[in-house]
Amino acid sequence: MGKAEVRAALGDPSVRLVNALTRKQHAGDGAHYGRPGRIPDSTCVPALMLVQRGTGMFQPLPELRAAVEAAGIKPGQRVITYCGGAIAAACDAFVLTLLGHDDVAIYDGSLAEWSNDLSLPMETG
């Protein structure tokens, strides 16, 4: 999915933007890509929280489901995942698909592209 499609999804309540970076990066603190922060109205489901430390295996299904539900992602909702460069976003997209979500896309350019385009909005905090 490209930048134009993500821009068109802004403000659309039928679409959920999901940032797979850390909560700190989501807030605009710590390491960032271009400008700090996130794409407006996105929620954060850190990819690192979806895997078990040490083994790299995914968390059990009930924990994955709880993380997705806590982020407000509803069944049947279109979801666009992103991160810094689409790697962590692929993890989130896989988990969403595993949990039965069938309308999931990855913003390939992610924040490496979005945050470097000064015409596009960013949020922090």
Kindly label every feature range from the protein language model.
Residues M1-R16, A20-G125:
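Rhodanese-like catalytic fold shared by cysteine-dependent sulfurtransferases
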